[in-house]
Amino acid sequence: MTYRIYLVDDDRFLLDLYAVKFKNAGHDVTVFGGGEELLAALRKEGTAAPDAVLLDVIMPGMTGFETLEAMRKESLAAKAKIIFLSNQGQESDIESAKTLAADGYIIKASAIPSEVFAETMRLLEGGAKAQ
């Protein structure tokens, strides 16, 4: 099955790295440099809804948490799996993600791209929420 994956990160190198991983597996990937860019695309009439959004926490402008709050408030991409992909591994950040009903939280520094890909696929294919 082909999934539509949205990647949101201000680090262009990481965006490209993850995009290649998902594209090579046959998935449709769109990258965004920040939360505002993602929200603008989701609000645009006729935009295809993503199956998953991988969202960095710390970005210029809106944080990933603020972005997800706006998405929830406006019912944007309501059926998408939301996975935080961040270097922020503090328990308070993980708790914030849970409060916002994120489906997963991956710490970039301790996960190679193939692990990020595998966890995303697990969640998309009906895996339980990460704890």
Language-model region placement:
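Conserved phosphotransfer cores of two-component systems
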Residues: 44-48, 72-79, 100
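Receiver (REC) domain active-site loop signature in two-component systems and cognate sites
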Residues: 59-60
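Active-site residues of response regulator receiver
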Residues: 56, 86
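Acidic, metal-coordinating helix/loop segments flanking the phosphotransfer/catalytic sites
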Residues: 31-52
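Conserved acidic segment of CheY-like receiver
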Residues: 2-13, 18-22, 53
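Receiver (REC) domain switch/output surface
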Residues: 115-129
